[in-house]
Curated annotation (Swiss-Prot):
This is tRNA-specific 2-thiouridylase MnmA. HAMAP family: tRNA_thiouridyl_MnmA. The lineage of its organism: Bacteria, Pseudomonadati, Pseudomonadota, Betaproteobacteria, Neisseriales. Its main location: cytoplasm. Keywords: ATP-binding, Cytoplasm, Disulfide bond, Nucleotide-binding, RNA-binding, Transferase, tRNA processing, tRNA-binding. The gene is mnmA. It is found in: Cytoplasm. Residues 99-101 are annotated as: Interaction with target base in tRNA. It catalyses: S-sulfanyl-L-cysteinyl-[protein] + uridine(34) in tRNA + AH2 + ATP = 2-thiouridine(34) in tRNA + L-cysteinyl-[protein] + A + AMP + diphosphate + H(+). One of its GO terms (biological process) is tRNA wobble position uridine thiolation. Residues 150-152, 307-308 are annotated as: Interaction with tRNA.
Amino acid sequence: MNTTANPSNIIVGLSGGVDSSVTAALLKQQGYQVRGVFMQNWEDDDNDEYCSIKQDSFDAIAVADIVGIDIDIVNFAAQYKDKVFAYFLQEYSAGRTPNPDVLCNAEIKFKCFLDYAVGQGADTIATGHYARKEVRNGVHYLLKGLDQNKDQSYFLYRLKPFQLERAIFPLGGLEKPEVRRLAAEFNLPTAAKKDSTGICFIGERPFREFLQKYLPTDNGKMVTPEGKTVGEHVGLMFYTLGQRKGLGIGGGGEPWFVAAKDLTKNELMVVQGHDHPLLYTRSLVMNDLSFTLPERPKEGHYTCKTRYRMADAPCELRYLDDETVELVFDEPQWAVTPGQSAVLYDGDICLGGGIIQSTDKPVIITR
């Protein structure tokens, strides 16, 4: 197990999913004093068919009962709305594509939840993330999870050293099928529950319908790089770079992909073919930097992920100033998207990263 410490009192974030359920069961089995917390972080339209918060809370309570631990239900809805959801809407309004799970981890799971747990006398918090942690010479290192298909270090890159010191990831050395098998062995009601793919804490729902409740939309043209109109979009915020599905462009030839957004003209630029040169970039600029180690990485050669589950891309790190980094890739990268996170690695060590602001292609045009 990935504790790298000897905590006596651990509070587990129980989400109602299989991963956190097995996390709690493993810690209890290994003799730790364990309690659970279910975080209720979304209250808007919680009575509709898409939001699973109520069912998730029932599942978390059932898991706690089977494992034999106490569980508290704690409401962080106001903090979520202020720290995560407001940013989410702001980024979509600006034409970018945010990743709320990254901010949710930094602001809610490893800040609000951590503060609550410490206030309750806990030494450590545990979550069901597929990531590992090692302590070397007193320094806590965030490492990739052993299961390459499930590694979630990408979503944890904004954790600070003090947060890592108080966190453990018991599933980091396991693969998903093993976690499912353990859940069945522990007779957990979540053993066969499907993984969530919705927005962090909000659940799975039709995205366009959801976003329209909070932001105004305006239809506009889909155009080629030459300026030819080939279709109509239903609002720039509903599209992301590299998107293929849902464009509704007829005719023959290769599939169409989103290549850029022009906010001044309210136009969506589309190109034909996955390998169109406008979909590839050699460099990016990122800011809003956050690093997992006490010292930020030096300029040099690393690998990077610009989206979850992509293969590591070798790159050169250059500081433009204290708050801004340029990454130059060894090979062109496909559909690098402003608003997403670029996360740096040194081997298996997650060093941190930042928010992509621009690339060497004009993909978000604002003037």
